[in-house]
Amino acid sequence: MNSAQVMNLGQLLNQSSRQFPQRIGLIQGDQQWTWHQLQERVHAMAHALQQLGVQKGDKILAQSRNNVQMFESCWVAFQLGCVWVPTNFRLSPPEVAYLAQSSHANVIICESVFAQHIDAALAAAPTLKHVIAIGPARPTEHSYEDLVTRNLGQQPSETVVSYDDPLWYFYTSGTTGKPKAGILTHGQMSFVVTNHLADLIPGTNENDCSIAVAPLSHGAGIHALLNVARGAPTILLPTEKLIPEMFWQLVEKHRVTNLFTVPTIVKMLVEDEAVDRYDHSSLKYLIYAGAPMYRADQKFALQKLGNVLVQYFGLGEVTGCITVLPKHMHSADDANPNANIGSCGRPRTGMQVAVLKEDLSPAAQGEIGEICCRGPAVFAGYYGNEDATQKALRGGWFHTGDLGYLDDRGFLFISGRQSDMYISGGSNVYPKEVEEVILNHPDVAEVAIVGMPDPKWGEVGVAVIVKRDEHKNLSGEDILAFLDGKTARYRWPRHIQFWSALPKSGYGKVAKKDIQALLQQQEHSQ
């Protein structure tokens, strides 16, 4: 354990308020807040919670859509030395109850519209003592805005932290079982913010502007920290649903320079006709992560937006800090060696990346193994789950569960999740390789391939395809004919289905577990 004192990450907000008190820090709809106003509100809420008995180490659960209170809640937690436990607001009451119980939450900051979630959390978590309602408060609850109003001008007592003091429980869904709380610490996150600024949005300052298109509870929240550190404002969408037309309007109006999202959202935004009606020349960095981006989608985005794409690869446990493919390493020209087709880039600054075999020895160049990393961005473990921690950190490396290989330059190529790979007739099949080929078909918009049990082959691939035009006549035979000569036959999906849409997670990732479950339901109903 590292007991050395470090800067409380909450100081980032204080520093921007001191440097740029009258500059805008947050915008949502027709409302905006200066850095000074945000700091005053955060100090007021932190003081109010201290008066309620909240102290260092307590856990603050946050269940809310993106709004100023959700944005502030992490800074309140950080400055108090508490642990921020954000949820995806789309979770059900039982799912939020599990997070409250497993994190031993002491406080819940929650929008009033999620009253059922509050009640479920209170029933499941005996540690939960205080409910702070965003919106109308019930008799047993405190109103967020009332607490802020009554405590404006008050200063919370300063909380000193050490390197290993936790500040965020980053829940990861994983491939099996219940979500696990990855412990992010003040020391680790100070490195992460510095690393992201250096590798993802270098040169960002108070004259830049960011827009959040995903819930602040995960990657979008981490990206918001970077902009706070540089005094750059963040725009929150005024609607729960992402509307491409509105997005491009906001980019033009506020001269947005950077954003973080996932490949499916990039695809949706650049394929919408609104992209051609608004000025997006201010964009410097469109950062994508969370899932592979198919080459066809990457090329289209580059053609529409110019050289602004930045890819990073990483998991919540290392807050994305494994590899980066900067914008100068992207190209829409397949013949350009700097296109780095299929690669997710080079190791992040200060991080070491390795591909290991099952015995933890290094895989040869070009040999597929498990992608592992080590460095200051690695988390402190899973809260209350020592077995999972030991498994994830065995041999002195963080094990991602992703498969890939390194080329002669040390650039990383991902083959897929260990859990995505299936074995058909004794051969390992990595769906991503086949998905890439199918996506080059002009009539295919989206595709996902999953392994399903088969009495003859052990497992076979099932491809689920979304057509660009639902009225287009496209058959499974057409897809197989397209694959012929482009990839080995043993990799071909055994079954092909056409769906109107692919199920996605709350963060826009294709949910392969849900696809498998739906396919199993089909099988059982036959």
Predicted segments with their positions:
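Conserved AMP-binding/adenylate-forming
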Residues: Q5, Q31, A46-P94, V213, ...
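Structural core segment of the AMP-binding/adenylate-forming
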Residues: N14, Q51-L52, Q79-V148, D469
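AMP-binding/adenylate-forming catalytic core of the ANL superfamily
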Residues: L91, I108-C110, L259, G375, ...
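Gly/Ser/Thr-rich phosphate-binding loop
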Residues: V256-T261, V270-A339, Q352
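Conserved AMP-binding A3 loop
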Residues: T34-H36, L167-T194
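Conserved pre-ATP/AMP-binding loop-to-beta segment of ANL
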Residues: Q22, A133, P139, L152-Y171, ...
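Conserved ATP/PPi-binding loop(s) of AMP-dependent carboxylate-activating enzymes
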Residues: R346-G350, D359-K391, V429
